[in-house]
């Protein structure tokens, strides 16, 4: 079984998450099989992005060691997505206090995108 190393856990709960919250969420982590980790963290199939024809809004974290910003920018460019770079947060965006900021940006984007 595999557990994420401490630096990956720290990256998940970095930024504005309090030490107490980070510890609480860390205590909920459970060991995974190496196969499950591989499937969850590697792109196992290729997608021809030339055929993606839908509006997309991508949220990325500037200092995310799990999903490098360079790759996120490349995806956004390839599919013509709007990209929002988040500061002072870790990979676990839904667990961070910035989540309210993220959700506040979705509705205006949807309205602007669907009325074009």
What are these regions (language model features)?
Residues 82-116:
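Catalytic active-site module of serine/aspartate enzymes centered on a nucleophile-bearing elbow/loop
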Residues 78-79:
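Short, structured coil segments at secondary-structure junctions
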Residues 65-74:
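Conserved alpha/beta-hydrolase "acid-adjacent" motif
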């Amino acid at each position: 079984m595999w557990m994420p190393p401490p630096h990956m856990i720290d990256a998940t709960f970095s930024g504005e998450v309090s030490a107490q919250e980070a510890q609480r969420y860390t205590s909920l982590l459970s060991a995974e099989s190496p196969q499950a980790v591989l499937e969850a963290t590697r792109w196992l199939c290729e997608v021809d992005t030339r055929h993606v024809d839908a509006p997309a809004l991508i949220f990325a974290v500037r200092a995310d060691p799990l999903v490098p910003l360079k790759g996120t920018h490349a995806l956004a460019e390839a599919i013509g997505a709007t990209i929002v770079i988040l500061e002072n947060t870790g990979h676990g965006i839904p667990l961070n206090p910035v989540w309210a900021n993220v959700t506040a940006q979705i509705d205006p984007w949807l309205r602007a995108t669907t009325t074009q």
